[in-house]
Amino acid sequence: MANQHANHSINDFKQFVKKHPKLIKEVRKEQRSWQDVYENWVLFGESDPIWDPYREPEEASEAVPETPQKNDFVSKMVTAVKKMDVNQMNEQINKMSQSISSLQSLLNTFSGSGQKHSQPGSGQHPFSFRKD
């Protein structure tokens, strides 16, 4: 089922690209990558104003009447959060936590004061996460 969704998404993106020939030219001139275009398409959708410069002139006039809610930053952020993979976010947060812990350890090692006192919890990660 995930494969069908991916194929459907790819076909929708292909249709979107066909409607925006200026976008194709920009990618071919290596000003943008297809990955960048696809990620923006997934995050913002087809009707976002960022695509206006790439539309055909008659299509751009059709896309002008939009609801103010679609242009709202908060609604875009909510949409982006809904599309996030929770496991991937958890993995990234754990990596960041380990990096911060390593940095704290490094700073404690090279602190110039010469004090040898240990902070409580210095061997632990700075953030406490549990699995639900």
From Swiss-Prot:
Taxonomy, superkingdom: Bacteria
Region annotation (Disordered) ranges: 107-132
InterPro entries: YlbD_coat
Protein name: Uncharacterized protein YlbD
Gene: ylbD
Record field: compositional bias (Polar residues): 108-122
